[in-house]
Amino acid sequence: MTRSVWLKADSEVGDWETRKRRITAGIEAGVDWVLVDEEDVDRVSELGEINIAAFTNGDVHVMEAEAEDSEADATIVGKDGEGDGTVDLPSDFSGSADLSTLRQNGAAPDGGYVRIFDEDYEAFAEAVAAEADFTIVIGENWQIIPLENLIARVGEETDLIAGVRTAEDARTAYETLELGADGVLLDTDEVDEIRKTVEVRDEMGRESLDLEYAEVTAIEQTGSADRVCIDTGSLMEHDEGMLVGSMARGLFFVHAETAESPYVASRPFRVNAGAVHAYVRTPDGGTKYLSELQSGDEVQIVDANGRTREAIVGRAKIEKRPMFRVQAETEDSDRIETLLQNAETIKVHTQDGRTAVTDLEPGDEILIHHEDTATHFGERIEESIIEK
């Protein structure tokens, strides 16, 4: 599931300058959507590239006129209506103005906004979810229980967006009933809280890999080859690197160049990944040849515990360098190998931690990621392929 962060920036937030500061902070932090009033759409679009959702009053004639001029990516009904309690809920939802608006052909809104005051509004939110692409729910007195109920009942009918005020609230919403909300609507002016919420979103979307140790069975000099350094647009931590190897089923953990040495400065944005033929793991679970990498591509950063995140390639630097062939054997006797540059700055991960490839010896245990699948054009497939 891809999670999203929405930022509330309508007239309830304050005057335009206040809303503008909030929206700008959201764009800089990397939120996915801003929720604004219809009259703000044009000037919000001038602030930067962002998905814009706009409250609409639900009048079909006004909506049709607005649709011709508006640049909103989605329209939301419910503000100043039944959804936020301005208009009383009808005893029979078949008479609901908000639901009727959502059911219109043509210029119908894309989503509904509901404040959960009690069980009646919870039921109303469920009815909205049956009609809307996006269902935004704001818990007034209770937050977790109504959200749990809606997650259990709504399923995949709609993108369920839960109102929150902090990053920790967002984490709870994302984790509720394990499935969690599809997104959160954040209501805060705190820049740090906006950034932390985006970080929580990213964390929730990260893959966690099972890494294991394989025994080094051979390490030998092989002469020169075209070696690739992957220079990313991200700074990596001391325990981070990438998964690379000659065989997609068995990839070696290679550390980023974060360590200082007397002879060369650290390059914490770089992984010296090996020869051009090798694979590197990508965020979608596939692989790419090192020779194919170019600026703008996505690669997967992984730490020694298997936690992952994405990074953008800024540059792939190819140079002829002397190489080592590193061969290892997994617990189930599968042989894997790769070519790594013969240099002290290239570090793999052994039971002793960061270890220079020049210090590796047969019998050492080296950190890898092993899968019982082959790849075809970078996609995992169930097929018998011999690689040697």
UniProtKB/Swiss-Prot annotation:
Catalytic activity: 2-amino-2,3,7-trideoxy-D-lyxo-hept-6-ulosonate + NAD(+) + H2O = 3-dehydroquinate + NH4(+) + NADH + H(+)
UniProt GO BP: amino acid biosynthetic process; aromatic amino acid family biosynthetic process
Keyword terms of this UniProt record: Amino-acid biosynthesis, Aromatic amino acid biosynthesis, NAD, Oxidoreductase
MF GO annotations: 3-dehydroquinate synthase activity; dehydroquinate synthase activity; NAD binding
Entry's EC annotation: 1.4.1.24
Pfam families: DHQS
InterPro entries: DHQ_synth
Entry annotated with the keyword Cell division: no
Function as written in the Swiss-Prot or TrEMBL entry: Catalyzes the oxidative deamination and cyclization of 2-amino-3,7-dideoxy-D-threo-hept-6-ulosonic acid (ADH) to yield 3-dehydroquinate (DHQ), which is fed into the canonical shikimic pathway of aromatic amino acid biosynthesis.
Family as reported in the entry's similarity comment: Belongs to the archaeal-type DHQ synthase family.
The protein, known as: 3-dehydroquinate synthase
Organism from which the protein derives: Haloarcula marismortui (strain ATCC 43049 / DSM 3752 / JCM 8966 / VKM B-1809) (Halobacterium marismortui)
